[in-house]
């Protein structure tokens, strides 16, 4: 039985487009978003992976499921008048069933905040099914959520590793253009492959962050 995707309003990610790799424009967008987050004082400090196929979400619905999950997080932090920023990149395996379609998220959580068990509840609400083990994996970047401030060199080193990991599904042209250390096709993805929070996209469009 196909899992339902919980509709929570807001914009609907594009569902019909099919791609097999990140484009040059998408890789550039991710890099700009990471720089913008740093300059805005909301550096990414949390790495989240959600295995949507394992959760029972159809590939065509995965972008909307990701948007719903991030809206839960945004609403939770917004209720405390706290900022939230993120980028996400979807991937798929090569049809061997090793991982299925999934999404990597780099997010900023304000100091002292944790999504903890809330995330599993959000997954249940999105899928309409019981939570399965290892659907969601999350960890702080550079071992501590405040590493960008306390150990900036270690933080930047670890962030660069995660950036390259998220970009490993870039096209050959993108990998060559940005001298990415590793490259392979990111698997077939139906719908939107890359996204970011509105506060980052607005700052990029306005040019307010140098």
Role assignments for model-derived ranges:
Residues 1-99, 109-210:
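Right-hand nucleic-acid polymerase module
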Residues 102:
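A short acidic, Gly/Pro-enriched loop at the edge of an enzyme's catalytic core
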Residues 105-106:
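Long, low-complexity, serine/threonine/proline-rich intrinsically disordered regulatory regions
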């Amino acid at each position: 039985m196909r899992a339902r995707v919980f509709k929570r309003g807001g914009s609907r990610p594009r569902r019909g487009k099919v791609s097999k790799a990140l484009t040059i424009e998408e890789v550039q967008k991710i890099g700009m978003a990471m720089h913008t987050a740093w300059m805005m004082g909301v550096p990414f400090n949390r790495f989240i992976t959600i295995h949507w196929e394992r959760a029972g979400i159809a590939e065509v619905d995965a972008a909307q499921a990701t948007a719903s999950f991030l809206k839960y997080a945004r609403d939770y932090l917004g209720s405390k008048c706290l900022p939230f920023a993120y980028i996400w990149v979807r991937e798929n395996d090569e049809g061997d069933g090793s991982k299925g379609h999934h999404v990597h998220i780099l997010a900023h959580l304000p100091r002292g905040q944790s999504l903890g068990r809330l995330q599993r509840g959000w997954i249940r609400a999105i899928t309409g099914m019981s939570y399965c083990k290892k659907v969601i994996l999350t960890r702080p970047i550079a071992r501590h959520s405040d590493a960008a401030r306390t150990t900036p060199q270690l933080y930047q080193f670890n962030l660069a590793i995660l950036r390259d990991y998220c970009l490993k599904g870039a096209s050959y042209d993108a990998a060559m253009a940005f001298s990415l250390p590793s490259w392979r096709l990111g698997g077939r993805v139906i719908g939107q492959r890359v996204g970011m929070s509105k506060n980052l996209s607005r700052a990029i469009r306005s040019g307010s962050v140098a």
